[in-house]
Amino acid sequence: MPGLPDQPVTAGDLLTLEELGDFRRASTLRGAGLVLHAWGTIGAAVALYVCWPSALTLTAAVVVIGTRQLGLVVLMHETAHWLLFPSARLNTWVGTWLCAAPVAVDLREYRRSHHQHHRHTRQPQDPDLPLSTPLPLSRPRLALALLGDLSGWTALTRIVGWRPRRHGIAPAWRRCRAPLIANAVLFGVLTAIGGWTLYPLAWALPWATWYQLVTRVRNIAEHGMLPSVDDPLRNTRTIRAGLLARAVVAPYWVNYHLEHHLLVFVPCWKLRRVHALLLRKDLGPRMECAASYAAVIGQATSANGPARA
């Protein structure tokens, strides 16, 4: 099929009504499988450290668990769009208690803010704009930011900088009630498995370090150094991710971000098919596709052009 005109692309330009229905359809089985995979991977990493405690297994657990904590955020993002399950109630319950609360995120607030992000991507009204600006940075400044993530400094500043009085005590309690309950449950479970030190080592430490790092890398990669235009092929980036990148940086197809912005109603596990569809329709030259996460980080420390695949 010849390439589409050089103008913003819509779902109707790409899909028939039958294809739209197929791409839009969520699956309870697939949604449950993804949540079970995230928590199963976390459990396996915890078991590795408990059975063979050492600096090496702890480091591996921190990386694996920190990445799956980002994975929980990715799955929470799916529930924010009502895409993880066909049931709205199930999306909200699972999104709140099994995805958002364990990593100290409020699903209701995220859903409200994230829909604004989609309406105003890379525009002044975009609430996520500060996450990908100002870029590019000098190598020392970006290295310092990444070191702050790995050292736990970023997490500490976020915790210390949170002020209940900004929103009032009652709203603040509503925001942190679910995270407190979820983490109390995690503390109890991990304490029963390996003693009270297991929670700080196997949950808080990954969250305070590797999770912060991969979250920053994700934010830079998805929208950093891109123009403020109303075209998801140009204001959002997809990143090629091999097996290693998917294991430690980009879980659950989060690297297909352009495809998500273009067809926001498509569940994450179908985004790879959307990517293939765009290439078949000769849209590849118009798409912002980076060769790797390393390539995007390299671009973030230079004034060079886009890190295209």
Segments the model singles out, each with a brief description of its role:
Residues V64-I65, Q69, A204-L213:
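Small-residue-enriched core segments of transmembrane alpha-helices in multipass membrane transport
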Residues A45, A80, L84-F85, D230, ...:
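Active-site-flanking alpha-helical
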Residues L213-R246:
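Membrane-interfacial segments at transmembrane helix termini in multi-pass membrane proteins
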Residues T67, L150-L156, L244-V254:
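Long helical/loop segments within the catalytic core of UDP-sugar-dependent glycosyltransferases
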Residues L72-H81, Y110-R122, R218-M225, A250-V266:
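Histidine-centered catalytic micro-motifs
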Residues E78-V94, Q125-S132:
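Aspartate-rich (DDxxD/NDxxD/DxxxD) Mg2+/diphosphate-binding motifs
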